[in-house]
Amino acid sequence: MSTDMKTSNKYMSLAAITLAFSFTFLSRYIWSPLMADVSGEFGINATQAGLYMSAFFAGYLVTQIPGGIMADRYQPKYILIACTILGGAMTALMSRITSYEMGLVIRVITGISSGCVMAQCSKVVALTFAPQERASAMGVVLASPPFGITLAQSLGAPLNQAFGWRTTFVIVGAVAVGV
């Protein structure tokens, strides 16, 4: 493989993992601009609405260490793809909730899928970039949180206003498939 092809591939990998990590933040923070409408439809109080974020982070927390172990043992690219697709599917599935409890379960599963992502991204950087390039590559990856949060906060309300909260969840979930 030519040097140009290797360079192109590593930057394509960097773009892919950055988008995947960004999606985890988009999917977790899209709840904020949709919260009022969902809460109104289901009679969810502020404490219950806050628990939707906590449910996500509970799932996220329990997969941090297993995600790192999987990154060391298996192909991180495939784990990253599976986690991103599962996260997208769960985000889209939020559009179909019929009860508060169903939403909690979906948010936990979304957190579980997202919790493995950072370890996979780190492993891809370690495998793809030379030691002297890794900090720069990780700098790009670590721009994902504010990027994903900015997308959620800036697009969530207009999408909700234009299409409703259910369709907004579907749109955000579909983004994962595109990643």
Residue ranges of each PLM-predicted region?
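Extracytoplasmic
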Residues: 13-46, 67
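Small-residue-rich segments within alpha-helical transmembrane domains of MFS-like 12-TM solute carriers
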Residues: 25, 29, 111-119, 150
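Residue-level signature of mid-helix packing/kink "hotspots" within the transmembrane helices
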Residues: 29, 57-65, 149-150
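MFS 12-TM fold signature
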Residues: 60, 84-91, 110, 175-179
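Conserved MFS/SLC helix-loop-helix module at the cytosolic interface between two early adjacent transmembrane helices
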Residues: 62-101
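Cytoplasmic helix-loop-helix junction between adjacent transmembrane helices
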Residues: 106-145
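Helix-loop-helix hairpin linking two adjacent transmembrane segments in secondary transporters
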Residues: 141-179
